[in-house]
Amino acid sequence: MTILLVGLGAALGAILRYQLTRIGNHIASEFPLMTFLINLTGSFCLGWLTGSQLSQPVTLFLGVGVLGGYTTFSTLNSELSQLWFRRRYHIFFGYWLLTYGLGLLVAAAGFYAGL
């Protein structure tokens, strides 16, 4: 049953990420805004989930499943690599610092919101 919950959640999270990315593709910018926003909102939600007192099945469905499928570490690093190899160093460092710096802050904010 747990595997089904996680798998269903992952599918829902991936579909949500895909749809948001499609919407965001209309924004012409070198900065990968949609991946940035997806990862920050996912960090906040995972922080909230960690601070909350939800049951283990709900936590697995939402945390491992939905948010695991929604957030995207691999796309982040792929985009960072592309920026680096295209010598867009100012965007690379801004994206890197903002994603990891704000990611930690919003995860902490989510954690405290979930208490």
Curated annotation (Swiss-Prot):
Keywords: Cell membrane, Ion channel, Ion transport, Membrane, Metal-binding, Sodium, Transmembrane, Transmembrane helix, Transport. The gene is fluC2. It catalyses: fluoride(in) = fluoride(out). The lineage of its organism: Bacteria, Bacillati, Bacillota, Bacilli, Lactobacillales. The chain crosses the membrane at residues 1-21, 31-51, 57-77, 91-111. GO terms for molecular function: fluoride channel activity; metal ion binding. Fluoride-specific ion channel. Important for reducing fluoride concentration in the cell, thus reducing its toxicity. It is found in: Cell membrane. Na(+) binds at residues 68, 71. It is a multi-pass membrane protein. GO terms for biological process: cellular detoxification of fluoride. PANTHER family: FLUORIDE EXPORT PROTEIN 1-RELATED (PTHR28259), FLUORIDE-SPECIFIC ION CHANNEL FLUC 2 (PTHR28259:SF16). Na(+) is not transported, but it plays an essential structural role and its presence is essential for fluoride channel function. Pfam families: CRCB (PF02537). Belongs to the fluoride channel Fluc/FEX (TC 1.A.43) family. This is Fluoride-specific ion channel FluC 2. It comes from the Bacteria. GO terms for cellular component: plasma membrane.
